Structure formats: C-alpha cells, structure tokens
Amino acid sequence: MARIAGVDIPNDKRVVISLTYVYGIGLATSKKILAAAGISEDVRVRDLTSDQEDAIRREVDAIKVEGDLRREVNLNIKRLMEIGSYRGIRHRRGLPVRGQNTKNNARTRKGKAVAIAGKKK
C-alpha cells in the first residue's frame, strides 16, 4: 500500500480511484493531480514507480487535504456560530443549515424522535 498524505491507498485499484481515499480528493481532483503529474489514470497503484509516487505526493502536498481541510471546515463553522449568522444558529441548534423543511423530516440532524406523553389517542 502506498502512503499519500498520511493515508494508505489500496494497491489493487487504479490510481485515479485510490487517490479518492484521501479526504478532500474526489474524482475530479484526482484526475487533475494525475494530469499534472503526467501519469495515466489506468495505472494500478502497485505498478507505480517511486518517481511517479513522489510526483503524486508533490501534487497532493500543494492541495489542502486531510487534517488541514478538516480543521479549516471546523473553524469556518465555529466562525459562523460566533458571529451569530443564520447558518451559525442552525449549526448551534443542530438543525439543517441549507433551507430544508423540518416539520416532518430532518431526522439525521435532529436525532431520534422523542415521544410526547399524552399525545396518542
């Protein structure tokens, strides 16, 4: 297994798919990285030379991934909560942030439904 940005990527998959195991790298970014490094998307990770692995590492190091990206996202959410914006208030209350209705659904954000005593008749 090759190690890129602190993540073990699978050996038996194509490089373009294996790179998506790194947080912050999707399929589009993976393709851009390989194009910049001059590596074919069809190559398997186990077939990469050490020079090719180093080229991929250099390209990935130029992008904000893994811990740095997670930290930035968390700081952005914290900043929204501190300034008291609508989105920050929704984050603080654990409700959907992007305008979804909450009358019936939104169970993922709100948690398990709590039964109200005396409601059933």
From Swiss-Prot:
InterPro entries: Rbsml_uS13_C, Ribosomal_uS13, Ribosomal_uS13-like_H2TH, Ribosomal_uS13_bac-type, Ribosomal_uS13_CS. Residues 96-121 are annotated as: Disordered. Residues 106-121 have a biased composition (Basic residues). One of its GO terms (biological process) is translation. GO terms for molecular function: rRNA binding; structural constituent of ribosome; tRNA binding. GO terms for cellular component: cytosol; small ribosomal subunit. Signal peptide: none annotated. Keywords: Ribonucleoprotein, Ribosomal protein, RNA-binding, rRNA-binding, tRNA-binding. Gene3D superfamilies: 1.10.8.50, 30s ribosomal protein s13, domain 2. HAMAP family: Ribosomal_uS13. Belongs to the universal ribosomal protein uS13 family. Located at the top of the head of the 30S subunit, it contacts several helices of the 16S rRNA. In the 70S ribosome it contacts the 23S rRNA (bridge B1a) and protein L5 of the 50S subunit (bridge B1b), connecting the 2 subunits; these bridges are implicated in subunit movement. Contacts the tRNAs in the A and P-sites. Part of the 30S ribosomal subunit. Forms a loose heterodimer with protein S19. Forms two bridges to the 50S subunit in the 70S ribosome. This is Small ribosomal subunit protein uS13. It comes from Streptococcus pneumoniae serotype 4 (strain ATCC BAA-334 / TIGR4).
